A protein has these predicted regions:
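Active-site environment of divalent metal-dependent phosphoester hydrolases
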Residues: 10-15, 39-42, 64-68, 102, ...
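Glycine-rich phosphate-binding loop signature in dinucleotide/nucleotide-binding domains
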Residues: 23-28, 103, 150-153, 207, ...
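Active-site-adjacent alpha/beta core region of enzyme catalytic domains
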Residues: 95-120
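Active-site-proximal loop/helix segment associated with metal-binding centers of metalloenzymes
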Residues: 112-144, 184-185, 247-248
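Anionic-ligand binding region
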Residues: 139-167, 171-176, 188-190
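Acidic, His/Gly-rich catalytic cores of divalent-metal-dependent hydrolytic chemistry
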Residues: 168-259
């Protein structure tokens, strides 16, 4: 079995189209989309329209939950931008998406962790300061990953949310985060102020294959016209997103929490 795994598209249509072109060349059996699909100052409605036409296995992320449930005055700007531009059929599609998904064949999907769409699975934020004096983010320990797995025992668990491509073996389970298709850096205030940065503007996704020895993962980087996406963000008065899209780092201004 060959799976293409994507997550955290955040309405970045040109990044999605570039990844889709690569996926089509891999002859995969299934494409899995792990949520946070449309929120952001880019192309939410166009992204939703493209994905609704795909027969992908898709779950919702925290941003789908927020833009569907929160009143407009309590939404963050990324969710509010998307919510104002989505058609009714887009909202119905998002509302029907499950929070988690058991694909069978030993594959289980969540956005954050099995328990929460806001929890980091393979990273841990600590109050310890890194070299630039900011709270640090480190790879989660084996014990932390095992605790976050909870009762899930599938051989392959797919997660997103942190935008960081990473994989970790925990006993008999391989946990894979494909990174973000649409936004390579953001910062957040919880549980401590921190940054998640890939350090490059590429779209990220993963190719996961089952072999005799078990599941194997290839983390993929896809080039696309990120300058076009950055200019779109600037046109929508989101210089923070433009910086992240161009560099893979939080730049002149902070990028709102978009995990």
């Amino acid at each position: 079995m060959r799976l293409a795994v994507v997550s955290d598209i955040h309405g970045n249509l040109p990044a999605l189209e570039a990844v889709l072109a690569e996926v089509r060349g891999e002859h995969v059996d299934r494409v899995v989309n792990l949520g946070d699909i449309v929120s952001g100052p880019l192309w939410p409605r166009e992204t939703a329209a493209l994905l609704r036409a795909m027969s992908w296995s898709t779950i919702r992320g925290n941003h789908e939950r927020q833009l569907l449930a929160l009143p407009a005055d309590r939404m963050g700007p990324a969710d509010a931008f998307a919510r104002a531009r989505l058609a009714e059929e887009d909202l119905h599609w998002l509302a029907a998406l499950p929070a988690t998904l058991d694909l069978g064949d030993g594959v289980w999907c969540c956005h954050g962790t099995p328990a929460s769409d806001l929890q980091y699975f393979l990273e841990t934020v600590t109050p310890d300061l890194d070299r630039d004096g900011s709270p640090g983010v480190r790879a989660a320990t084996a014990a932390e990953v095992a605790d976050r797995l909870g009762a899930v025992t599938a051989p392959l668990v797919l997660c997103g949310h942190t935008h960081m491509p990473r994989a970790a073996q925990c006993g008999g389970t391989l946990v894979v985060n494909p990174g973000s298709v649409g936004l390579p850096a953001f910062d957040d205030e919880h549980p401590y102020a921190h940054r998640m940065e890939t350090g490059s503007p590429h779209a990220r996704w993963a190719l996961v294959k089952r072999a005799e020895a078990g599941w194997q993962v290839q983390q993929r980087l896809t080039a696309y016209d990120w300058e076009f996406a950055a200019q779109r963000a600037e046109h929508k008065d989101r210089g923070d997103w433009a910086d992240a899209l161009r560099t893979g780092r939080v730049g002149r201004t902070e990028v709102e929490a978009c995990g």
